[in-house]
C-alpha cells in the first residue's frame, strides 16, 4: 500500500496546497487544482493508498475554512473508493 503523509507546512495557501497535492499524490497533469477535481482524481485511484492528514489541518490559519473542506473531500473520496484510506493523526 502506498502511504502519503501530508505536510501542513507545504500548504501555505490554497494555490500552494493544490500544487503540493499534485506532487505528493502524483495526480495527473489534467488535475484542475480545485476540490472537485481532487475528489475526481482520488475516486479514480487504482493502487491501494493511505493518506495521512495532520489533525490540525482544520485549524490552519493559512487555509482557513478550506482546510475543513479539504478534509471533507478526502473523507468523501475514501468512502467512494474502497482502496483509498484517509487517516487523521
Model-identified regions with their sequence ranges:
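Positively charged, polar, low-complexity stretches
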Residues: 1-89
